[in-house]
Amino acid sequence: MTETRFSKDHEWVRLDGDVATVGITDHAQSALGDVVFVELPETGRHVDAGEACAVVESVKAASDVYAPLAGTVTEANGALADDPGMVNAQAESGAWFFRMTLDDRAAFDALLTADDYQAFLATL
């Protein structure tokens, strides 16, 4: 079963078995504007929750992408390097940034549900 959760830093995490796929939310890509460059983490890199591990640059600004959970990067989405505009078109689907194995599966459950994330956005 696939579940999706969200961070207050505007990343989404889709958990499928033991693999977590991470990307930025539609809200984040909308705030950034047209994305022109993406820097992805290296495969095999261990990241801590809250650690800056990727960069997304737009015509407006550059922003760090934070690891919403601790774990090891197992794959980066190389398609984003060739077509960073995918982030704008497919923020919460095909434009994932990286996949990782989690250090602690229970930490996933502590992230925001879709309803909680929408409520959080309403406070911004």
UniProtKB/Swiss-Prot annotation:
Q: Name its species.
A: Acidiphilium cryptum (strain JF-5)
**Record's protein name:** Glycine cleavage system H protein
Q: Which GO terms describe its cellular component?
A: cytosol; glycine cleavage complex
HAMAP family referenced in this protein's UniProt entry, alphabetically: GcvH
- Similarity field: Belongs to the GcvH family.
Per the entry, which co-factors are needed?
(R)-lipoate
PROSITE patterns per the UniProt record, alphabetical:
BIOTINYL_LIPOYL, LIPOYL
| Lipoyl-binding domain mapped to chain residues | 19-101
